[in-house]
């Protein structure tokens, strides 16, 4: 169950290095137009110290957190931001969508399978702080809007990511490869 925070908040979870697009995220959230949105950053990495020094009071660095803490942050966040420069298919996007969060992400990577632009989140260009900021502004206007977008295609994502269905699909593919007709 979700219990979103009363004020707009969002989450980034991942390794703090360039491929994740984290510097563009921090740049977006240091802009005065997002000072009312709390950004929680879970993870550690090479860029953390440098980016933390640039942060404004609305950016909170959590470091490495437990699975339970991650679930708690997913439960209270209005949305997830994953501004990757190139990810195969990040688990955090899948987890967020299964929990009913809208996601701001880029067109680079497999996560676009779970996010429909303008419907269940926003797909922004890579390396574009202004686009991240604009999408975050849209999602932070109203909790009702964020919740509504999060529920779009929610059941479809749950079905796609169901463990039984995933295992059955993999076994079926292996069977087809091993025993071609």
What are these regions (language model features)?
Residues 8, 12-31, 41, 46-49, ...:
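A conserved mid-protein helix/loop that constitutes part of the nucleotide-sugar donor-binding site
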Residues 49-68:
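Nucleotide-activated donor-binding/catalytic signature segment of Leloir-type glycosyltransferases, i.e.
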Residues 117-118, 122-129, 138-143:
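Conserved acidic donor-binding segment of nucleotide-sugar-dependent glycosyltransferases
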Residues 64-65, 72-77:
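Short alpha-helical donor nucleotide-sugar binding micro-motif in glycosyltransferases
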Residues 71, 90-98, 112-113, 119:
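Short alpha-helical segment that forms part of, or immediately flanks, the ligand-binding pocket
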Residues 144-175:
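A charged, aromatic-enriched C-terminal amphipathic alpha-helix characteristic of glycosyltransferases
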Residues 102-105:
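Short hydrophobic beta-strand element within catalytic cores of glycosyltransferases
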Residues 85:
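Aromatic "clamp/platform" in nucleotide-sugar-dependent glycosyltransferases that forms part
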